[in-house]
Amino acid sequence: MAKSGLLLIHPAITTTPEEVEKAKADAVAADVKIANQFLINKVNEGSVKLQKGIYDVIYYLTPEAPDAILFPKKLIGALNEALKVGGVLYGLSDKYKIDALVNDFDIVSDSGKYHWVKKVNMAVKAEPVAVPLKKSEKSEPSKTLPSFKKAGESKLPSFKKAANKPLPTFKKKVEEAKPKVEARVHKAENDDDELEDEEDENLFDASRSKYFDEDDSESLDEDDLLNEEDAKNIGGITMITCGKSKTKKKKACKDCSCGIKEEEEAEIDNIRSQQDTVVKFTEDELTEIDFTIDGKKVGGCGSCSLGDAFRCTGCPYLGLPAFKPGEPINLDSITDDL
């Protein structure tokens, strides 16, 4: 007897009807009769409903590659219900392997064509079976339970009440009064503190006096501490030896009052005046280097009026602002530097 089959078609496969005919021919060769043929989108929308447990084989025909198949996962459970126990589903790949296991499919890929098989143990539900209980052939005589006699009521022991005797009385021991001990406090007077301070000062003075002997026999004369060279310079004048001429020269003390300090200041002023006369320029000499006056000598660059960026390293106008050609420039401010 031929198996009942279902053919589900992808909408894109309708453009190649030869693929559909080939799939039907393969089914007939496998002894499968295609009972129904539906578009997968119709089943997904619910316009076509599959009956439960009537198909032995379901074929899904799609032009997609096995790794790129797009199949609605909710239909995997519906296809499982449409198959009979042990039914086979062709056309899906390992991309939906987890969904197949969840919906009670076994995956077969070892031999032949890859397919899914509906599990038998999950589809068939075990029905409850009644098991009769057999009685034992030899009926054992019923055993009577042991009987227990109620213990006789025994009389409780009786106790005689003791005679009422008065309790012994105890007198509180009288505590002997302890003699009060007054704390002896020695009150120090202020006079004692003053006496102690005076005694400490006397001891301190006595300890210091041993380092200061007032004997006149050990006093030194201050003149005995000076040597001959110190005696010569006792006048307060310091002699300085010149590094070139090797001659000694007097130098005034810090608080000189003998007139040597004034002589040194006059000598310094004389040297300064001689230096000023050596490097001082006359007005004509200053005019010769004035580049702004026509007919006078000019610098090699001729750009002194443009500013420091255009002046030579030895230009006398360095540091001055830029000026117009022909504008008189006063160089008195730099005479001290020349």
UniProtKB/Swiss-Prot annotation:
Please indicate the residue ranges that the annotation assigns to the motif Cx2C motif 1.
301-304
For region Linker, the annotated ranges are 166-232
State where the protein is found: Cytoplasm; Mitochondrion intermembrane space
Region Fe-S binding site B, annotated ranges: 301-315
Q: Which UniProt keywords apply?
A: 2Fe-2S, 4Fe-4S, Cytoplasm, Iron, Iron-sulfur, Metal-binding, Mitochondrion
Q: Which residues bind [2Fe-2S] cluster?
A: 242, 253, 256, 258
Q: What is this protein called?
A: Fe-S cluster assembly protein DRE2
| Species of provenance | Candida glabrata (strain ATCC 2001 / BCRC 20586 / JCM 3761 / NBRC 0622 / NRRL Y-65 / CBS 138) (Yeast)
Q: Which gene encodes it?
A: DRE2
